[in-house]
Curated annotation (Swiss-Prot):
Pathway(s) per entry: Cofactor biosynthesis; biotin biosynthesis; biotin from 7,8-diaminononanoate: step 2/2
UniProt source species: Macrococcus caseolyticus (strain JCSC5402)
Protein name: Biotin synthase
TM annotation in the entry: none
Protein's UniProt keywords contain 4Fe-4S: yes
Gene field: bioB
Family in the record: Belongs to the radical SAM superfamily. Biotin synthase family.
Keywords of this entry: 2Fe-2S, 4Fe-4S, Biotin biosynthesis, Iron, Iron-sulfur, Metal-binding, S-adenosyl-L-methionine, Transferase
Amino acid sequence: MLAQRIINGENISKEEALSLFVDNNIDTYDLLHEAYQVRKYYYGRKVKLNMILNAKSGICPEDCGYCGQSKLMKNKDKYLLVDSEQIKSGADFCATHDIGTYCIVMSGRGPSDKEVEHIADTVEAIKHEHPQLKICACLGLTNDEQAKKLKLAGVDRYNHNINTSENYHDEVVTTHTYQDRVDTIEIMKANNISPCSGVICGMGETDEDIIDMALALRAIDADSIPVNFLHPVKGTKFGNEDNLTPERCLRILSMFRLINPSKEIRIAGGREVNLRTLQPLAMQAANSIFVGDYLITDGQPNELDYKMLEDLGFEIDINESEINKAALKI
């Protein structure tokens, strides 16, 4: 049994993973069942909730082909870094709605030192009011000194997605390298900030690219892996892409779980438009979701997510230490 091999500690190879992913003779729901056995072993029926705040929007020199905030987009919502009270208001909402992780996101290549100070001061205030709330910062490319300030302020996690495979990266963006992204993740790890890194599927990548992404994140050892499904933005390079089906999304999530068995696999942007009515099934592979809106696209109403989890018989987990430690042999 595939799931039992993985639970026993075996890392599946690229060759086997790719074969599982592309073989039409392997039923999607059989593959999803294997993923669920692994998910259940590490997380039971628990689900982590995350919420995003778009704290700075549309001001960016990068040319990412999926992004409505890139330098190539003319009609976009632009604003500078919001004040502390607005950021803290989002934290208050999280604390009263069983949302365990609050993600503060900024557009741009990377933050200025002044912006890092602003975020750090605000995070300190949030931690004073809500010490159990996990704070994830997503500010772009950073340096070691900035990472130290964020750690000291109480930032628990830092998100910087690899977005795609190293082989496909230059088709997605040309203003920074794949290694730039990996370097930022490594800086955070060196400063004992939990690394969060994920992908965007549906940008024209190959099946092999999908598997390469999951394997790269295994090598990076990201604690949290958001899996985004492209929600095409009109006017972007990938604005006309339409190659995802709900079933393909389920296969992708299954492979990310099987390749990264103990990690937090989060269904992120684009789940509503790509998974559609199969969103509940996706929770058999994933153990985490974003609630509320995304950066520039709308999510579904919160009450639908809470109701979905209730109907599934899943339990909201706001304590990130609740992973099955026996399973991890800690």
